[in-house]
UniProtKB/Swiss-Prot annotation:
<comment type="similarity">
    <text>Belongs to the UPF0137 (pGP6-D) family.</text>
</comment>
<dbReference type="Pfam" id="PF03677">
    <property type="entry name" value="UPF0137"/>
</dbReference>
<dbReference type="InterPro" id="IPR005350">
    <property type="entry name" value="UPF0137"/>
</dbReference>
<protein>
    <recommendedName>
        <fullName>Virulence plasmid protein pGP6-D</fullName>
    </recommendedName>
</protein>
<keyword id="KW-0614">Plasmid</keyword>
Amino acid sequence: MNKLKKEANVFFKKNQTAASLDFKKTLPSIELFSATLNSEESQSLDQLFLSESQNYSDEEFYQEDILAVKLLTGQIKSIQKQHVLLLGEKIYNARKILSKDHFSSTTFSSWIELVFRTKSSAYNALAYYELFINLPNQTLQKEFQSIPYKSAYILAARKGDLKTKVDVIGKVCGMSNSSAIRVLDQFLPSSRNKDVRETIDKSDSEKNRQLSDFLIEILRIMCSGVSLSSYNENLLQQLFELFKQKS
């Protein structure tokens, strides 16, 4: 019986080791995700340490400590980004399985609700992973990884072709979160912003149609040979001056 237990233990340990190695093979290289702090993040840390500067006695050791903490901060960001990608990969694979014919169309969504505290976090990780794997090279993947989380999630989730998203990555790389989001809104506006813009465009179109009707009527009256009053001449003069200012 003891011999059987020993053999079972050896078997399980071997399989556990093999599974661990297989998992490590799927892990992206840590070098790929070594996050460099952007200027804003680095300045924030400098500002934090500035208040501590009066306490140091050795300038050289103090600077070494600051550099070490900055390095650790970058490594923490790398680990966080690895986590998001690994999470996104698992959700991506689960969706492939749950999209098969023998599952209903709502199974994947129900699975998300069952597994995750919020659906948005799952879909954000999925969108993040999908954009990452579709980027054509490691340079772009590194640039995408350097973008602040919120901006990266928004970029991944926004509707738009890959070329546009690649262009946006180049534009926002190194920017702060708020600056990056402003650029995103310009080149990849959200559906809500598009709807508002379309409503404004429709409103302008309707006003222009009405203005065309009024102007045509004014031209018709003036061509009829009517004698304009000084008041109407003044109104027309104001209209011409306003038009010159806008043109």
